[in-house]
Structure formats: structure tokens, C-alpha cells
Amino acid sequence: MNSAFPSAAAQIPAAIDTVRRFFDGLNHESDTGDEAPVIATFTTKCNLCGSGVYSIKTLLDGKHTLRGGHVHLLSINSAIATYNNVVSINVTESQDAAQQVDSTGRVVQTFPSSPPRHVIFELETDESPPKIWQLTRADE
């Protein structure tokens, strides 16, 4: 293993799995309202992670549902150990268009799709599995 931080580098596959579970968890919350799977992937330090979960929760309030709006992990661009206990993963993601629908089936709001964009996840490898502690939208 060619890394200045071999213990963190050894956790790269598990960190990538956590990022995949984050995307799956957001989509699960969007479909069901159950936020537990996505919350299990990040620490309380990840403000952008928490705001994403809260945004979905807010859209589902009042018995609303969401149609579409899934986020997609298009590619993993890089995954490197950046400190003794940190892995940085750069990905490309996109999001489908969505509709917020009320309990009668009426569309309340529509949201356009988002084109592919780069996102950087920083994960702490002290825990097993690793957890996301920071999320940065690299294109903004």
C-alpha cells in the first residue's frame, strides 16, 4: 500500500461503501420518510449531511410524498487517505427532477433535475464502518 497513512488507506473500501449507503439512505428517506439509514452514515459534525436529511423531512411534512428526486452516485473519481484517520472521496453525483405531492395527489412543488456535479466526502476511519464528517460541493 503506497500511502503516508496506511491505517486510513486500509479503510478506503469501507469508506466508499459508507458513501454508497449515504446515497441509498437519502433515496430511502425520500421514498419512505425513514431517515435512520442515512443518519447512520454520518457524524453530527456533517452539517451539509444533516441539512439534506432535514430538507427531505420538511418536504414530507403534512403527509406529502415525493415523486422522483433520487440522487445518483455516477462515479468515484478518487479515494485517498489524507490523515491518519481520514479518507477523502471525490465523487460525481446527479439528482432526478422531483415533484412534491399532497395527500390528494396534487402536485404542490416541482424541482428540476441537477446536472452532474462533484462532491467531496471526508470520512473518519476511527469507527467501523467509517462515518462522513464533512461534505463539500466542489462545484459551488
Question: Residue ranges of each PLM-predicted region?
Answer:
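Short, well-ordered helical secondary-structure segments
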Residues: 43, 58, 76-78, 108-110
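A short, amphipathic edge element
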Residues: 61-79
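Detector for Asparagine
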Residues: 2, 27, 47, 77, ...
